[in-house]
């Protein structure tokens, strides 16, 4: 009898366990938040800083971590509400696109709806947005709407039917961002798991001691901008370089800038010499478009670029970075100065945006800010030409009467890809650039 009872009890327990194991878990699931595609062919990034730790409560749009790609510092924001259960990488570790950054335990049911609806493909263009939000076609007319309690609470507080909100999460899940978009509180170009260039971190302040002697050898990982420089310069070694040097009398430019400096100050514009160098280069490129070019990967074509996106080799706390000022041929000297100042400020804070680093067509490097006269700049592939500008020096020169007079002299060093640029073209371009700097008022004649 006792054995029979035990067998009966065991059978009931087995059936109960079987029933429990076949039930779907409908609460507190753990999801992986993965590193989304940053773009520009970037496959991996370095984790510079975590803004969360295991056990922290996190919400949608909260910052998760800051990563450093070869081109820019990027802040990764979350797309879930929940609790951080696991961090997958250490600080300074490398994370690959598509791999998990963190595990998040989220509230709500993640099981698929019993009768998922297949959305019909629409060929009609999206209607323009009006001031009052218009309900999109329901994506949840059949089955259960997937959303966390936090999202449902926002919907209830704003008297919104979640069935009218198109979910962009997995399996049509409605995210907080979707509800806020529906309310018109979030710009349309904001995306979950967005990668925003950081805006809060400042460049590290220098300590009172300018250096600290090393007591032993230190291995420094090649990361961030330096890693990008390694790749670029390795490619540049494949280019046969042609060099050309010259000097420019910038007496007139010094006076011209002094006249405009106060006028620029009234407009809150810091006016250095660099905007003049950039504008003069752009005007000269109009006459020699073969220098405002890029080559294709197979070296079968040289693409003459319509836009003058002039790159500036910039020294930053994170290493060398080469952003560019777009459409210099359409900008005035003051407009170029404003854009230059923006890039310089962003470089100091390591906040250079990705769009500022792409599509460059020609490069200038102002080594004169640090010192030096001549240099041997390296072409920035796939571009075909670069110039290095030395410091302005007061040097003795002969006037037309053979008298020795003091003259403001600036030296320039050009380098070009000798596979596609001949020496004569580089020399003629340099002469035209030199003419505009020695006669700065001539630049005004070119303005439209």
From Swiss-Prot:
PROSITE patterns in the cross-refs: BIOTINYL_LIPOYL, LIPOYL, PSBD
The organism of origin for this protein: Caenorhabditis elegans
Protein name: Lipoamide acyltransferase component of branched-chain alpha-keto acid dehydrogenase complex, mitochondrial
Cofactor comment: Binds 1 lipoyl cofactor covalently.
General function of this protein: The branched-chain alpha-keto dehydrogenase complex catalyzes the overall conversion of alpha-keto acids to acyl-CoA and CO(2). It contains multiple copies of three enzymatic components: branched-chain alpha-keto acid decarboxylase (E1), lipoamide acyltransferase (E2) and lipoamide dehydrogenase (E3). Within this complex, the catalytic function of this enzyme is to accept, and to transfer to coenzyme A, acyl groups that are generated by the branched-chain alpha-keto acid decarboxylase component.
Binding site for CoA: 257, 272, 315, 365-366, 390, 392
Upper taxonomic lineage: Eukaryota, Metazoa, Ecdysozoa, Nematoda, Chromadorea
Protein keywords: Acyltransferase, Cell projection, Cytoplasm, Fatty acid biosynthesis, Fatty acid metabolism, Lipid biosynthesis, Lipid metabolism, Lipoyl, Mitochondrion, Transferase, Transit peptide
CDD domains named in the record: lipoyl_domain
Gene3D superfamilies: 2.40.50.100, Chloramphenicol acetyltransferase-like domain (3.30.559.10), E3-binding domain (4.10.320.10)
Modified residues (N6-lipoyllysine): 71
């Amino acid at each position: 009898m006792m054995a029979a009872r035990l067998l009966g009890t065991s059978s009931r327990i087995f059936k109960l366990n079987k029933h429990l194991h076949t039930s779907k878990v409908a609460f507190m699931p753990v999801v992986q938040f993965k590193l989304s595609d940053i773009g520009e062919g970037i496959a991996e990034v370095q984790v510079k800083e975590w803004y969360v730790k295991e056990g922290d409560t996190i919400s949608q749009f909260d910052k998760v971590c800051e990563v450093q790609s070869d081109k820019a510092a990027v802040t990764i924001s979350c797309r879930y509400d929940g609790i951080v259960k696991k961090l997958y990488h250490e600080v300074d570790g490398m994370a690959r696109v598509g791999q998990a950054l963190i595990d998040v335990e989220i509230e709500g049911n993640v099981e698929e709806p019993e009768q998922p609806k297949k959305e019909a493909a629409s060929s009609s263009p999206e209607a323009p947005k009006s001031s009052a939000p218009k309900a999109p076609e329901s994506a949840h007319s059949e089955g259960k709407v997937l959303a966390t309690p936090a999202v449902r609470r926002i919907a209830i507080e704003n008297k919104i039917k979640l069935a009218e909100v198109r979910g962009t999460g997995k399996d049509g899940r409605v995210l907080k961002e979707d509800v806020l978009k529906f309310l018109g509180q979030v710009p349309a170009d904001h995306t979950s798991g967005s990668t925003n260039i950081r805006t809060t971190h400042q460049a590290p302040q220098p300590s009172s001691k300018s250096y600290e002697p090393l007591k032993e050898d230190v291995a420094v990982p090649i990361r961030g901008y330096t890693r990008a420089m390694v790749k670029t310069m390795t490619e540049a070694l494949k280019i046969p370089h042609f060099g050309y040097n010259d000097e420019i009398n910038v007496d007139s430019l010094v006076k011209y800038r002094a006249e405009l400096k106060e006028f620029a100050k009234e407009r809150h514009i810091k006016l250095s010499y660099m905007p003049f160098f950039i504008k003069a280069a752009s005007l000269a490129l109009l006459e020699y478009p073969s220098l405002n070019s890029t080559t294709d990967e197979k070296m079968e074509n040289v693409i003459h670029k319509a836009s003058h996106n002039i790159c500036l080799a910039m020294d930053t706390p994170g290493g060398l970075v080469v952003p560019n000022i777009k459409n210099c041929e359409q900008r005035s000297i003051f407009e170029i100065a404003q854009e230059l100042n923006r890039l310089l400020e962003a470089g100091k804070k390591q906040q250079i945006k990705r769009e500022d680093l792409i599509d460059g067509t020609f490069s200038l490097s102002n080594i004169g800010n640090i010192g030096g006269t001549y240099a041997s700049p390296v072409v920035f592939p796939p571009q075909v030409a670069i110039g290095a500008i030395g410091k302005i020096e007061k040097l003795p020169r002969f006037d037309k009467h053979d008298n020795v007079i003091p003259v403001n002299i600036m030296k320039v060093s050009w380098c070009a890809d000798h596979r596609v640029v001949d020496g004569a073209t580089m020399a003629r371009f340099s002469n035209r650039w030199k003419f505009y700097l020695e006669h700065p008022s001539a630049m005004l004649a070119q303005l439209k």
